[in-house]
Amino acid sequence: MRRLLFCTLLMTGLTQLCCRTQGSAPQDSTPGGRPGAALEVYQRTEVCRWPCRCPPQRPTCPPGVSLVRDGCGCCKVCAKQPGDTCNEAEICDPHKGLYCDYSGDTPRYETGVCAYLVAVGCEFNRVYYQNGQVFQPHPLFSCLCVSGAIGCTPLFIPKLAGSNCSAAKGRRKTDPPNCGRGTLQQQNSASYKTMSAYRNLPLTWRKKCLVQATKWTPCSRTCGMGISNRVTNDNANCEMRKERRLCYIQPCSRNTSQAVKIPRGETCQPTFQLPKAEKFVFSGCSSTQSYRPTFCGICLDKRCCVPNKSKMITVRFDCPSEGSFKWQMLWVTSCVCQRDCREPGDIFSELRIL
């Protein structure tokens, strides 16, 4: 009797174990729960091949297009531009803040489109441009706003004249001093020397250092508080460093013309000041003192007034619960009105066609 009971219990346990094993067996199903359908597996195409095989000559990229190494780390290629297709090998232009957006190629995520990262825009001549926006402030140049910085490329590229050194076979080569000048004879033209990039730097001997300094750049803002910079080695180590200073060309108030009172019988008022002193505001911090700066005025004719004399002052700013800091600032002392009118931030004001 005991043997029969033991065999019955053993058979019951084995039967339950087999049922559980069969019930836990995996079934092919789709994400929707339909049994019998296998999951679809996507395999991405391999775009990189090793060892690297690059063309003998580097590609020539159009103006404004970066020459970068491909995503495989092999060859130099022209970076993809906004709206171009991209992948792991064909990367987007990193110098323009571009990235490859694969959201339109789900679920493979193999091919994307170059798009701009979210970033701040640019302000140029009192006009605001969005990040990635292309604009043309000058007939000869096209500009692009990238994360608060402006980069420009020429619209017209002069065709290089044939070199005098390229002679037919069997001919004697031209003397080296005459090679590469072309028909424009740019070396004989003195017009390019009027550009600020070709002017001699201000030089001063100080101990054993020949002090050099570039001109201050135009103010980054045409109204309100801006920044200008220059490069100089006027420091203890006689090293070339970038210096920055604040600049306040004109207030951004629309009632500026009402604040300027031109005397009767005159056509210009070179300078003007605000009715009362006010504190400067910079990066959310305010100056410890109130100032009444001098601004350049206006003319009734087509003349414009620009700074003539200025000096540097030190302004201390206090920040709420974040301490204080000091900045050097341009302080205008006098202005002059002239016919040669240029925008304070016009980077094309000194362009000359060679």
Swiss-Prot record:
UniProt entry keywords in alphabetical sequence: Disulfide bond, Glycoprotein, Growth factor, Mitochondrion, Secreted, Signal
S-S bridge residues: C48-C72, C52-C74, C54-C75, C61-C78, C86-C100, C92-C114, C209-C238, C219-C223, C247-C252, C268-C305, C285-C319, C296-C335, C299-C337
IGFBP N-terminal domain sequence ranges: 44-117
Pfam families: Cys_knot, IGFBP, TSP1_CCN
Classification via InterPro entries: CCN, Cys_knot_C, Glyco_hormone_CN, Growth_fac_rcpt_cys_sf, IGFBP-like, IGFBP_CNN, Insulin_GF-bd_Cys-rich_CS, TSP1_CCN
One example of a Gene Ontology biological process annotation: negative regulation of cell population proliferation
GO CC entries: extracellular space; mitochondrion
Gene Ontology terms, MF aspect: growth factor activity
Phenotypic effect of disruption: Deficient mice are viable and fertile with no obvious abnormalities in size, weight, skeletal development, ossification, or the occurrence of joint disease.
Presence of keyword Signal: yes
Domain (TSP type-1) ranges: 208-253
Compartment(s) of residence: Secreted; Mitochondrion
Glycosylation sites: N308
Record domain CTCK: where: 268-342
Signal peptide per UniProt: 1-23
Entry keyword annotation includes 4Fe-4S: no
Family: Belongs to the CCN family.
Function text: Plays a role in mitochondrial electron transport and mitochondrial respiration.
Protein name: Cellular communication network factor 6
Species, as recorded: Mus musculus
Lineage: Eukaryota, Metazoa, Chordata, Craniata, Vertebrata
